[in-house]
C-alpha cells in the first residue's frame, strides 16, 4: 500500500508517499480502505519526532480517517460498510487496521470525506467538555484557538448544548469566523488580555496553549470552574497558584486522547456517537472542512496548519 513517511527525521516537512506493508489484523480489528484522513496538530508534532505513537500502534501519522471496511476480520462487521475511525496512528495510508470499538457510523448528512474531519475532533471535544468537565446547558465556556479544527467544532457543540461561548483568536478575520459559528464573546489575544476581559467568568476553559496561559486561565475561572488542557502549543511549563484555586474549588485536568487505552477509547466513541452524532445529523454542527489536499501533498497540508493561516479543518484525500 501507499503511505506517508518522514524521509528525513531532521526535516519534519520531508513527507513522502512511499510503499508500506498493508496492516495485518489482530483479533477485534477491521481493515479499512481509507477514503480521507483528517490532519491534526499531533501529526505535525509527530513529524518533528516529539509525539511518538503509543507502544504497539502504527508508526504512520494520522489520528482519524474514514473509509470502507475491506476486511471485517473476526468482528462480524460487513465488508463495504462506510465508517469513521478514531486512530492512535495509521490514517495517512491507503489501508489501516482499526479496533472495532473505535469505529463510528458515517453521519447521515455527511460524506465519507467529511466524516474524516469529524471523528477525532468530536471525540476530543466531547470527552473533555462533556465527559470530563461535565458541561451543562447554561455553562459559560472559554475556548482558546477558536478558529481551528478543535475550536470550531467546540463552539458549535457548546452552542448546540445551550452554553455561552467566549473564544480567543489572533485576527479579526478569525474572530469573525468564530462569530459566524455562534461564539458570543470574541477576544483578540494579540490585543486584549482575556483574563482581564473575562475575570471570574468561565465555568469551563478548553485550552490548547498550555503553560503560558495557566495563570491567566485560573484568573478567568469562576467558583467551581474547570480548566481542561488538551495541548501545550505554547509550552508545558507555567505558574500555578494553589492559593488562588482552593477558595474557589477550581480543578485542572491535563489530558490527551491518543495515549488512552483501547477500552477507554471505545467508551469515548460510544458516548460521542450517542451525544454528538445527533447534533451533526440535525445540522447543529457542521464539519467546516476548509482545505483539502491529496495524500501525496501531505507536506503542503502540514505547512498550511503550521502557518496558522487556516480556519476549520484540513483533510487529506486518497
Question: Where are the language model's segments positioned?
Answer:
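Glycine-rich beta-strand-centered segment in the early N-terminal region that forms part
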Residues: 21-38, 50-90
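NAD(P)H dinucleotide-binding glycine-rich loop of Rossmann-like/cofactor-binding domains
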Residues: 45, 82-145
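Short, well-ordered loop/turn sites that connect or cap secondary structure elements
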Residues: 76-77, 135, 221
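Short, glycine/polar-rich helix-capping loops at beta-to-alpha or helix-loop-helix junctions
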Residues: 91-94, 169-177, 237-242
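Adenosine-nucleotide cofactor-binding segment
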Residues: 143, 159-216, 265-267
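N-terminal Rossmann NAD(P)H-binding glycine-rich loop of SDR-like oxidoreductase domains
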Residues: 147, 155
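Residues forming the Rossmann-fold NAD(P)(H) cofactor-binding site
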Residues: 152
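Glycine-rich phosphate-binding loop and adjacent beta-alpha segment
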Residues: 161, 172, 212-284, 310, ...
